[in-house]
From Swiss-Prot:
Induction remarks: Expressed in the early phase of the viral replicative cycle.
Signal peptide: none
Organism: Variola virus (isolate Human/India/Ind3/1967)
Keyword terms: Early protein
Name by which UniProt lists this protein: Protein OPG034
Family: Belongs to the orthopoxvirus OPG034 family.
Keyword match Zinc: no
One Pfam family cited in the UniProt record for this chain: Poxv_Bcl-2-like
Top-level taxon of origin: Viruses
Amino acid sequence: MIMSTDPNNILMRYLKNLTDDKFKCIIHQSSDFLYLSDRDYTSITKETLVSEIVEEYPDDCNKILAIIFLVLDKDIDVDIDIETKLKPKPAVRYAILDKMTKDIKLTDLVRHYFRYIEQDIPLGPLFKKIDSYRIRAINKYSKELGLATEYFNKYGHLMFYTLPIPYNRFFCRNSIGFLAVLSPTIGHVKAFYKFIEYVSIDDRRKFKKELMSK
């Protein structure tokens, strides 16, 4: 039974006895509510993880802990009701992220952004900046978005659909905006795969440098 006491003690009580492999399993499988940069995957400690969870979810530590152990297939009892369909919350790191940093992959950023748009999750500062591309796409590509939606409704995918985005220095950001508008319709996974298919690694790198310079 998890007692409703100090959140730090609750979390540390259960994390401190985990093996390193189990702890890595938490990091890699709990992506619905945790985001760690490449650097943090190898350097984060249990204490740091606990402090971030407590800071970001002060009223939901029991729930977060229960989800962690469900991920690990460990049956535990809790003194709270865990909803069967929890509305995903912003990832720990991304909820407060206000700027792009070099150790964050652009693909991770875009993947989470599309998921947040599809699932109507509140956006952090950096995502709000990126969301301006979606708003711009709604105004600029209304007809094209309608055609893309018709294509998807007919075929169930956008594999052979050519995005109506002219190739210029704004190609990556405009592609993100266009696909973000479609994300609630086609799903964030298909929107993300279309982004990977359509935007080259070089264009992604250029766009990441642009984000880092702001």
